């Protein structure tokens, strides 16, 4: 690695630099020689396993680190862990710590990292990014491949939120095809984004294939946090692919979904002016998401392995909870 980038192993997804084999994340973390990078990687591993309290505790000492890689990583870990812990003020402070504008004297690599982390902090909350993709493109080559892959996820997620599902999928699949190394965490993000786009394009087989690839990465190390966080956007894939075959994992994932989404909405809703529903079960929310995308009750039933009557009853319950009467009204309460 070039001298100017020596600090970059301490980026978000630090363990990816060591290209660990799924099932060996602990060995990869233990093998990181720099103690600060190893601590951040430990916090990441804890976070991706759904251990928000320990992740935040481990990363917190680096919130004011002078090394921008350590600081940005700690802010993102603590910020998102705080959502699951319902510490909304802490989440806001940590995520705001990423948004400090870099000075002109900072290197292109640091500037690129700042744009990426600031964009991730916003886009993952479904809020406008403070930077455009065009501002990032000239600097992207200064990042190592693992972070460039994560950047592809962030940009693909932004395209998804704009309803550009084909472009979103193309960006993800191009990143996966063109990568040189193996970066499990970034690849997990990318496969989840591809699943989201495929579901919105109603290419269910492709969505399940990408979700299966994500699960193959996540399951050996118990990296279930991201799957739980993406629940609504995955539009029933978790239920269709995991509920019967992996009931214990499914239960833990749904627990993460409830915990994370509650905190997520407490920032997203007031900051966006939207009113994403907060009193639906995960099953109700999934069915409502699919209904908003134009799925019939019969299609929803086949996808989720239930009867059309069950779907009808669940959606009636959703309308009653939200005080609405039509699918057109439902859209205002769903994720984009």
Regions found by a protein language model. Give the residues of each.
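Linker/hinge segments immediately adjacent to helix-turn-helix/homeobox DNA-binding domains
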Residues: 132, 147-187, 191-282, 298
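Helix-turn-helix DNA-binding segment
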Residues: 265-316, 320-336
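Tandem amphipathic alpha-helical repeat scaffolds
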Residues: 2-11, 36-51, 70-88, 110-127, ...
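Solenoid-like repeat scaffolds
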Residues: 25-33, 60-71, 97-109, 135-147, ...
